[in-house]
Amino acid sequence: METFCLKVTFWVALVGYVIGDHPESYSTNLSTPVDFTTFHGTELSFLVTTHRPTNLALPSNGSMHSYCPQQTKITSAFKYINTVISCTIFIVGMVGNATLLRIIYQNKCMRNGPNALIASLALGDLIYVVIDLPINVFKLLAGRWPFDHNDFGVFLCKLFPFLQKSSVGITVLNLCALSVDRYRAVASWSRVQGIGIPLITAIEIVSIWILSFILAIPEAIGFVMVPFEYKGEQHKTCMLNATSKFMEFYQDVKDWWLFGFYFCMPLVCTAIFYTLMTCEMLNRRNGSLRIALSEHLKQRREVAKTVFCLVVIFALCWFPLHLSRILKKTVYDEMDKNRCELLSFLRLMDYIGINLATMNSCINPIALYFVSKKFKNCFQSCLCCCCYQSKSLMTSVPMNGTSIQWKNHEQNNHNTERSSHKDSIN
């Protein structure tokens, strides 16, 4: 876990190092004075206008009345370093999430309720990594929106924020469902369930995806290609353009809505159900049946710790970005002559927050690898193609979705049957 934390600290420091000294690239009236595409996301930046734009026109010298007195800019090194970070997240996210899905799919005894929710979370992250990250890399290197002068660019402009918001919604709702599932598992501690995904879990997963897509519809509606003029040339960029009263309302409350639903809700849900789970465990410390099932309860507690770790990582990855948005919404005043220092701080926090938030799409498999030794063995066996010969038998321990362990053929049938029975525990 220490290695994992050090890696996160390294990337944060790296991003902070390449930030330039130009705070005013965050204009509240325009996405950026020259380059609309230097940020690591569409919705996850200050590129969204606070007022409804029509056709934007910049002065030929690229300056505006609201700019800070000092000239500022983003260093060119940022593009390439941020591209390396994006490519790393792309590779790790694609390999990690795909491997996680393969592990759960190929091992029949791993197909249980908690694992199904983890697979749903991994699939949502995989979709974002495969589709959205390449667009980010193109924007960073090309300095413009892809296909910005044809209909396919308009399609990407709507698809990009839609998938981005859907992916976050899938993550948030799956974490809530995992917290509820862990409470149910502890509350019904005497129930031993067989192999398979419960019907209620399947319904939850389908509902999570449908709700996530529905909540992301305003993003697809609001984001359009907005034309603007700069130095006598016509350009287009993808940004939020409120054209109706509902979209104007959505744009006004968007930061608070994202902070409340997509950040606070999973934390509150986890706090509530983990508190109930702790009370349940303390109230049932005694009893002969509980003693007999102590191993199963221990395994369930281990899964609860794993889920809690995923929630904590989610909070750490997304908190800086939400904090910068709330501060920008409540504290920053574009008419304040002393705003430049605050804007520099918000800009730094925003860059760090954007990269951390994007990193969350690849970090869950890594977290499972370090938190669970059994999951670590499973990843190693899958990635390194270490298959045991006829002298080894693969079985899965508790159906809590955390492990795979290996048993020798030399074990007697009695022990094998006991191991198979333990595999059915969720």
Swiss-Prot record:
Interacts with HDAC7 and KAT5. One of its GO terms (cellular component) is plasma membrane. One of its GO terms (biological process) is regulation of blood pressure. It comes from the Eukaryota. InterPro entries: Endthln_rcpt (IPR000499), ETA_rcpt (IPR002175), GPCR_endothelin_rcpt (IPR051193), GPCR_Rhodpsn (IPR000276), GPCR_Rhodpsn_7TM (IPR017452). The gene is EDNRA. It is found in: Cell membrane. Glycans are attached at residues 29, 61, 241. One of its GO terms (molecular function) is endothelin receptor activity. The modification Phosphoserine is found at residue 424. The chain crosses the membrane at residues 80-101, 112-131, 159-180, 205-228, 256-277, 306-327, 347-371. Receptor for endothelin-1. Mediates its action by association with G proteins that activate a phosphatidylinositol-calcium second messenger system. The rank order of binding affinities for ET-A is: ET1 > ET2 >> ET3. CDD domains: 7tmA_ET-AR. Keywords: Cell membrane, Disulfide bond, G-protein coupled receptor, Glycoprotein, Membrane, Phosphoprotein, Receptor, Signal, Transducer, Transmembrane, Transmembrane helix. This is Endothelin-1 receptor. Residues 1-20 form the signal peptide. It is a multi-pass membrane protein. Disulfide bonds join 157-238. Belongs to the G-protein coupled receptor 1 family. Endothelin receptor subfamily. EDNRA sub-subfamily. Residues 102-111, 181-204, 278-305, 372-426 are cytoplasmic. Residues 21-79, 132-158, 229-255, 328-346 are extracellular.
